[in-house]
């Protein structure tokens, strides 16, 4: 944020050529941010990554209102010779309504975040609120504090028209920039004149631009969220069903050794293993939900600062580990908190569920796993449920048990107490008289003693003898026989229906393309299911589709709000179309920049698109407003459009350059900054296309739509209705 503010200040200094004017603009940034934080505090929001990201994103745009105000004042004072006090009042009043409309337009487009749901809503609503409140505070400051500071700081500054010879390095550089800018402005005016006279050029360019945007949109691909490099790796290892805990531990040690070969010591901090389920009473809602037994576990790897990309190590481990341990199953889980939230509790990006009571669903789920694993871009495809774990079934002789005063429930309870401790079925406590701390008292057969089938048969079973009234411990082998079989170690249900989950992740391909291939597979396999069974795709695919749909609806409503806002401001239904018709060029720039930088279309980049559209609308509104004023003074639509472009080129370029340069550090990104990088790249791409569109296509559209009103005062639509 500080780097962005510094670069923004540098661009303003270059364009205005005055450190005093730059100071006037930069004063509004911290005050607007603090005002936004105050409002967020009263709304119950916290200072977190998303609110800070929103404020960092807003740094470039916060200077917009103050920049336009001081540029307009500076033009009236330095170029037209108006006294400073009069220029301050007239300059602020002249753009008060247009800047209000442009600020509200930016705020309107950010209202689309309210249509989000799920994790995306809780992530991006604070970001949107931070930007909106900062923008509103910036407008209030530009109406109050900025004119005051202009009067205080600029009164001792010499005018550009005073004819003084520049002294000092900065003054000479500023004068040289002004000469270069005037040549640019003259060249722009000549080029705009050509566009306005040769009307076929703009439609041809527009068609080419839209075609480019359509191609880039197809090539960009879609994701729910960019991959975050948190410097952590979480590897899930599953040994064959029935593997003993000590064997599992040896496997994990061998896997650790292989990880150390792949990840050098200078890049890793530590490696931690978590094998099996918790031994004592523990709420498994707080544990890793994908761990199902003693043959299962997680290896967590923490990397040092400055490490090589985590994704490269993960890609290498996906190649090395299955080759070294072909009997074991490996899959990587989300290690960073953002991706864990986006997965919404699932251990993978994609969860394809086979639901229903039919026994054939297991075979369909296994075929589904094989089909998914063959899809390009799918990695770590595995069936979560383990259905072939070895087990002993105790077949109780009910007649013999009844003779001993037992029933099946009593025998089962005794087995449970012996193998899993009495803590589960009959918890007892002992309170330390000194400290008052209660402790569990539990009875359990030591695991090392249950080392054979005979030892299992010697499990004590309490036998109630009605004759003597005494309780005599008997042996389990007296009332039961044992049979080897297989059993499912875990069972899942959704809406009471049994579920088989096939989990998978994506690597080297966008989620949207993978989702399209998954839908083809599920459509084919759905035909093999009996009535009452179904296949459901959840996880990030579902979240992505919902978020894209809701954001699209939100953007549609935002466009309607912005249009109606301009209708009220311009008092006509026609002029707002000049602004609306220029927005597709902004979207074309966004998708083009995303393609060039290798960034997919995702929720953060859509948030950047929202901001770029808002800024483009704001600049177009100011230009159209100035052109309308010129036409009301009696100029033709051609002359008004040319004059508006010639006059507003400086604030448009200054605002766009300040935002683009301020976004560059965020766009470069780094480890853990991928979400902000996608957002910033979308803003930069949108503004790179929106700026020439505002300066060239908007005047062209204005001249075309208003050419019938040449030399005539234009009445508002509501005035026309009244007449």
Tell where the protein language model's regions lie, with residue ranges.
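Transmembrane alpha-helices and their membrane-interface boundaries in multi-pass membrane transporters
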Residues: 11, 59-73, 96-115, 122-174, ...
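Signature of alpha-helical transmembrane segments and their immediate interfacial
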Residues: 95, 166-226, 273, 324, ...
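Hydrophobic transmembrane alpha-helices and their membrane-interface caps
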Residues: 6-75, 115, 133, 561-648, ...
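Interfacial helix-loop-helix hairpins and adjacent transmembrane helices
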Residues: 79, 85-89, 119, 125, ...
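Helix-loop junctions and hydrophobic alpha-helical segments within the transmembrane domains
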Residues: 70, 76-101, 124, 548, ...
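Solvent-exposed, membrane-proximal periplasmic/extracellular interface segments of envelope transport
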Residues: 246-344, 399-425, 434-435, 448-449
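Extracytoplasmic/periplasmic membrane-proximal domains and adjacent transmembrane bundles
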Residues: 1-3, 13, 70, 85-87, ...
């Amino acid at each position: 944020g500080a780097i962005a503010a510094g670069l923004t200040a540098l661009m303003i200094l270059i364009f205005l050529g005055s450190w005093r004017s730059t100071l006037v603009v930069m004063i509004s940034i911290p005050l607007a941010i603090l005002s936004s934080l105050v409002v967020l505090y009263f709304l119950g929001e916290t200072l977190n990554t998303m609110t800070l990201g929103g404020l960092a994103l807003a740094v470039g745009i916060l200077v917009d209102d103050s920049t336009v105000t001081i540029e307009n004042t500076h033009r009236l004072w330095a170029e037209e010779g108006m006294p400073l006090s009069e220029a301050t009042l007239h300059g602020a009043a002249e753009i008060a309504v247009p800047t209000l409309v442009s600020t509200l337009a930016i705020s309107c487009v950010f209202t689309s975040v309210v249509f989000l749901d799920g994790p995306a809503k809780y992530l991006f609503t604070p970001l949107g609120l931070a930007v909106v409140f900062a923008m509103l505070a910036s407008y209030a400051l530009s109406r109050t504090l900025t004119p005051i500071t202009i009067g205080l700081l600029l009164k001792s500054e010499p005018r550009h028209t005073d004819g003084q010879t520049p002294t000092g390095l900065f003054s000479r550089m500023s004068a040289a920039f002004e000469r270069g800018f005037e040549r640019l402005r003259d060249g722009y005016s000549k080029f705009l004149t050509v566009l306005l006279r040769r009307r076929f050029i703009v439609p041809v360019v527009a068609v080419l631009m839209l075609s480019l945007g359509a191609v880039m949109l197809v090539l960009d691909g879609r994701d729910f969220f960019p991959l975050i490099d948190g410097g952590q790796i979480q590897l899930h290892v599953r040994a064959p069903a029935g593997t003993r805990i000590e064997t599992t531990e040896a496997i994990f040690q061998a896997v650790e050794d292989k990880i150390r070969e792949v990840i050098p010591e200078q890049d890793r901090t530590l490696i931690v293993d978590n094998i099996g389920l918790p031994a004592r009473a523990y709420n498994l809602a707080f544990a890793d939900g994908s761990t199902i037994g003693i043959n299962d576990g997680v290896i967590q790897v923490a990397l040092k600062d400055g490490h090589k990309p985590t994704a490269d190590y993960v890609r290498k481990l996906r190649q090395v580990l299955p080759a070294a341990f072909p009997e074991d199953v490996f899959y990587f889980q989300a290690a960073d908190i953002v991706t864990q939230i986006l997965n919404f509790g699932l251990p993978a990006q994609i969860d394809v569920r086979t639901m229903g009571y039919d026994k054939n669903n297991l075979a369909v789920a296994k075929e589904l796993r094989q089909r998914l694993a063959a899809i390009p871009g799918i990695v770590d495809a595995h069936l979560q449920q383990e259905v072939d774990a070895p087990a002993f079934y105790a077949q109780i002789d009910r007649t013999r048990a009844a003779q001993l005063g037992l029933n099946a429930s009593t025998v089962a309870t005794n087995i449970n107490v012996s193998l899993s401790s009495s803590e589960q079925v009959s918890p007892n406590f002992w309170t330390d008289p000194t400290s008052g701390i209660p402790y569990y008292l539990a009875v359990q057969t030591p695991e090392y003693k249950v080392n054979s089938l005979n030892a299992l048969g010697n499990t004590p079973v309490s036998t109630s003898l009605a004759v003597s009234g005494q309780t005599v411990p008997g042996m389990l082998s007296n009332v039961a026989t044992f049979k080897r079989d297989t059993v499912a170690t875990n069972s899942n249900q959704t809406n009471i229906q049994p579920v088989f989950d096939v989990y998978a992740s994506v690597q080297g391909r966008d989620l949207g393309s993978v989702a399209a291939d998954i839908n083809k597979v599920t459509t084919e396999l759905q035909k093999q299911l009996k009535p009452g069974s179904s296949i459901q795709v959840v996880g990030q695919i579902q979240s992505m589709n919902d978020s894209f749909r809701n954001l699209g609806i939100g953007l549609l409503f935002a466009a309607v709000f912005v249009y109606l806002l301009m209708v009220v401001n311009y008092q006509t239904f026609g002029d707002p179309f000049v602004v609306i018709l220029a927005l597709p060029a902004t979207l074309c720039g966004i998708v083009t920049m995303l393609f060039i930088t290798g960034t997919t279309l995702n929720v953060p980049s859509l948030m950047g698109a929202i901001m770029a559209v808002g800024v483009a609308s704001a600049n177009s509104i100011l230009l159209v407003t100035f052109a309308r004023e010129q036409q009301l003074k009696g100029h033709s639509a051609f002359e008004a459009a040319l004059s508006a472009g010639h006059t507003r080129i400086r604030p448009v370029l200054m605002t766009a350059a300040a935002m683009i340069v301020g976004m560059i550090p965020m766009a470069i990104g780094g480890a853990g900054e991928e979400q902000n990088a996608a957002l910033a790249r979308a803003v930069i791409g949108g503004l790179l296309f929106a700026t020439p569109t505002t300066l060239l296509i908007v005047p062209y559209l204005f001249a075309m739509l208003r050419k019938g009103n040449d030399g005539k005062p234009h009445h508002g639509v509501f005035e026309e209705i009244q007449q």
